[in-house]
Regions:
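Alpha-helical transmembrane segments of multi-pass small-molecule/ion transporters
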Residues: 1-316
Length: 316
């Protein structure tokens, strides 16, 4: 019961900040013109600062193997998610090719950053949050390399290496060796305080933009038409995938910090970023929104159940 209360405590701010972004858009405080600049600040400044604040001085990341295994697990989870979701999209006859690709991309990738980071930070120690950030590098690589095959590759003129080297990935590539070399021990206190303050802004601001995006698309989407799309996404993302994640965490002797990360990621709904990609490139925004919005709403009930079950089963 205590664990369930902690999980709800970690979840509630996330949902309320998203709601705040939704309201801010609807009442006109946050317009669409501001979205791109805000996300640029989050992705290129605040989120890298967040990464530095959790990686530097993190003893759990001093071992080089900890910089290899978590990203590998994260990458494999997304590759499997995309592959299974595409196969099922075709079997279930979700729609035309464009809609199947969007369904596979949206269902195959979970909300790997904005939701799990505050939950992990509250339920586990600082070292586990660091492992989560390293794990997410593998997710990013899979999303940009394999994911673009569903939505981006035909239209994005940038070469693959430019898409892979996002600011968060660069921050990981710099901060991990700095942590190995214990450079943090030679930095002044004001540098850490500045990085920490910037990093604390990343998640709230990103969630506000997510809420605003929901507000934009919710008015146009016909949520209760073609119910096989959201229902299939809920079954795949919030039932089948969590069971698979927890099963592999149970049978494979991963470190406890990585098992904790796998558990939290297992419970996550579909990611929001596919909505933005489908909106800008050759995807179906309606399919992406149905998948993301439905799994996000349902996850409010399923996240505590899966995390509570996994904590006991994995003895975390």
């Amino acid at each position: 019961m205590h664990e369930t209360g902690l999980i709800f405590t970690a979840m509630m701010p996330v949902f309320f900040i998203i709601l705040a972004g939704f309201v801010a858009r609807r009442v006109g405080w946050l317009n669409e013109a501001a979205d791109r600049s805000l996300m640029n600040v989050v992705v290129n400044l605040l989120y890298p600062a967040f990464i530095f604040s959790y990686v530097l001085g993190n003893d759990a990341l001093r071992n080089p193997i900890d910089a290899v295994l978590p990203p590998l697990v994260g990458l494999c989870s997304i590759v499997a998610g995309f592959s299974i979701s595409m196969l099922l999209a075709r079997k279930l006859k979700i729609g035309d090719q464009r809609e199947c690709r969007t369904f596979a991309f949206s269902t195959g990738i979970y909300n790997y950053a904005y939701f799990p980071i505050p939950i992990v930070a509250l339920l586990f120690d600082r070292e586990t949050t660091g492992i989560l950030l390293i794990y997410n590098v593998g997710v990013e690589i899979a999303m940009w390399s394999l994911g673009v095959g569903f939505i981006l590759s035909a239209n994005d003129p940038k070469p693959l290496w430019q898409r892979l080297l996002s600011a968060p990935v660069i921050a990981i590539l710099i901060s991990v060796p700095m942590n190995w070399l214990r450079v943090d021990q030679h930095l002044p206190d004001f540098a850490f305080e500045s990085i920490d303050l910037l990093g604390k802004c990343a998640i709230p601001l990103g969630l506000i933009v997510i809420g605003a995006t929901f507000a934009d698309l919710a008015t146009d989407v016909r949520l209760f038409e073609r119910l096989q799309i959201p229902l299939s996404a809920v079954i795949i993302r919030l039932a089948a995938f969590p069971m698979s994640f927890i099963f592999f965490a149970l049978i494979i002797p991963f470190p406890d910090e990585l098992k904790a990360v796998m558990l939290i990621q297992a419970a996550m709904p579909c990611g929001v970023f596919p909505i933005l990609l489908a909106r800008q490139f050759d995807g179906s925004p309606e399919v992406a929104l149905k998948v993301t919005l439905t799994t996000t709403i349902v996850s409010f009930a399923t996240i505590p159940l899966w995390i509570g079950f996994g904590l006991k089963l994995l003895n975390l």
